[in-house]
Amino acid sequence: STASATADAEGSANMYTEFAAVVVDKDGKILADLIDTIQPKIGFDAKGEITTVTFNGTKKELRNDYNMVTYGGAIAEWFEQATTFENYIVGKTADEVNAIATVTNAEGYQVATEADADLVAGCTMAINGYQESVTKAIANAK
């Protein structure tokens, strides 16, 4: 979310960065991987000068304090869903990770389809950004 700064009130902007790291074999298949996200909040004044930066840790570091189940009605906390995704893509290539079909859910997020039942059983969060991050990490690992 964002808010414009005024003469009386600080403005704010949220930054959202997804990232991935992978270990791949000679054929580009994932041997190990991790995904995570940072969401710092930035405050700024009417001149556009940054006045505050708040960062409470990555989603994995926050663990249960991210409160995806409590406030989002999710099937599992973010770090648990991330682990499901990480485990699911082990042994896959970039093309196979990108081939995981997604559909837009009611909240507007790209989530895995029922075609990937093993993934959907433990991961109902948006995955399209992580598919992209993993693909870039694989390209960088070669």
Regions found by a protein language model. Name each.
Residues S1-K142:
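Active-site- and interface-proximal helix/loop "cap" or "latch" segments in soluble metabolic
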